[in-house]
Every structure is written in C-alpha cells, then in structure tokens.
C-alpha cells in the first residue's frame, strides 16, 4: 500500500505543479490556510505581509485561481479551507469552518498545526462520519470502517472541479461500490492510508511558513 500511496502522491504532485496556482501555491497556500483557520476572511494585504510577497504579486496569483472564494470586499474566504458551508465540517479551536473535500480535512491539521474535529456524511448513505485528527496522527474515526475516495485527474486547472468534488468519505468499502463502478480510475483508501497520503502531499507546502511570524504562528 505504501508504494501505491507514493504513486498517487507523485501523480497528484505532477498534475498540481501544472494546474491551478502551480508553483505559487507552495508559498501562498499554507499561510493562507493558517489565516483562514482563525475563522475570518483574509485580505490581500495580510497575505502579502505574512508571505513577504508584494501585494501585486499576491493579487495576480489569486486572480489566476478559478477555485478561490472571494467575498464582496475582495477578501479571501476559501481555498480548500473555507468559511462557506460544505458537507465537510472542520472545527478548529471551537470555530466552525468547512473543507472542500474529505482529503482536505486530513491534510489541513498538519498545515495549520491544530487539533481538528471533523464531521462529514457518507457520500452514499448519509451516515455521519466523525474524526478527531491531530497534526501528526488520527485520534479517532467513527465508524472505524470509513474510507476515502481518491481520483487522479489529468487536468487540475480547476482543482475543485477536477479533484475535490470527487473526494468523499464513505462509511465502508461496501458503501463506496457504486462510486467505484462510476469512476473506473478511482480508488478508495482507509482513513489511515488517506491521512498518510495527505501527509505526503502536504510536504510540498512546508517551505511556505509565515515570513514574519506575526500571524497564525505554529
């Protein structure tokens, strides 16, 4: 399984580098997640200060991201982690946030350095799936049989459309059978294996710590 997980990581990394945000995500994504984890929208100026990048560069990158969620004041409210409700509830320090997909909920605790409580419905049965996840391990999963669906699309120009919208929790492998029938190239992983996949995917953002240490410090 470790070899299979590494193959998925390699495939997704290759597509991500060519897809939405490209290399810019390595310095933008993690600081933005850390700021969004505070439960409030994020200004371009705050992102520039935190990343040490010029305002115009940050603005240009954001304008190139088809999936980023912006409010009427031009502030970021979502990019993977979001203030806008989705089925994937993501609770940090008592703040109710949301994630775009099941795998996001497993990747983000390490990137924001926080313990997270997650609740998401089985994509097939609607049964609630509840997890407590620390940055470096999964504390609990209910039901223990839960799995995560994974796809490896060729085109990641819009990551939410191509990837996130197909990455779900299922209460068991049996509950995922119909989804697998409809997605011949898809896979399902145990939650533990999906967490390991997410951990490896998250390493591409390790260089992107806040530049000045003044915001969302881990």
Swiss-Prot record:
Gene Ontology MF term list: alkylmercury lyase activity
> Which terms does the UniProt entry file under GO BP?
response to mercury ion
Catalyzes what? an alkylmercury + H(+) = an alkane + Hg(2+)
Keywords in UniProt for this one?
Lyase, Mercuric resistance, Mercury
- Any one Pfam family here would be MerB
Q: What is this enzyme's class at the first EC digit?
A: lyase
What does the sequence similarity comment in the record state about its family? Belongs to the MerB family.
What is the annotated role of this protein in its UniProt record?
Cleaves the carbon-mercury bond of organomercurials such as phenylmercuric acetate. One product is Hg(2+), which is subsequently detoxified by the mercuric reductase.
| HAMAP family, alphabetized | MerB
- Protein's recorded name: Alkylmercury lyase
User: Encoded by which gene?
Assistant: merB
